[in-house]
Curated annotation (Swiss-Prot):
Keyword field: Acetylation, Keratin
Family (UniProt): Belongs to the avian keratin family.
GO cellular component, one term: intermediate filament
InterPro entries (alphabetical): Keratin
Disulfide feature: none
PTM-bearing positions, type N-acetylserine: 2
GO molecular function, one term: structural constituent of cytoskeleton
This protein's name: Feather keratin Cos2-2
Organism of provenance: Columba livia
Subunit description: The avian keratins (F-ker, S-ker, C-ker and B-ker) are a complex mixture of very similar polypeptides.
Length: 101
């Protein structure tokens, strides 16, 4: 039994909401009750170091040397092993925004 009438949903910008919501308060009276929860014991075993050493000048995801990194570029800006700005890469894939509802 619902305590309030469902509100009219606005047109969502993105995924459809799973449920409608209302702004008016929903009041239900319940009897007093108590619940005791006893957690079970959990044993967590952490592994040792997976990579004991990792070369600093290796291009991640490649088996070639860091010299190849100067060939890679994003919108004409060379990408090298010294770190680079991801903004030009992410703007290409994440730059589009939802239109307003």
């Amino acid at each position: 039994m619902s305590c309030c009438n469902p509100c009219l949903p606005c047109q969502p910008c993105g995924p459809t909401p799973l449920a409608n919501s209302c702004n008016e308060p929903c009041v239900r009276q319940c009897q007093s009750s108590s619940v005791i929860i006893e957690p079970s014991s959990v044993v967590v075993i952490l592994p040792g170091p997976i990579l004991s050493s990792f070369p600093q000048n290796t291009v991640v995801g490649s088996s070639t040397s860091a010299a190849v990194g100067s060939i890679l570029s994003c919108e004409g800006v060379p990408i090298n092993s010294g770190g680079f700005d991801l903004s030009c890469i992410t703007s290409r894939y994440c730059g589009s925004r939802c239109r307003p509802c």
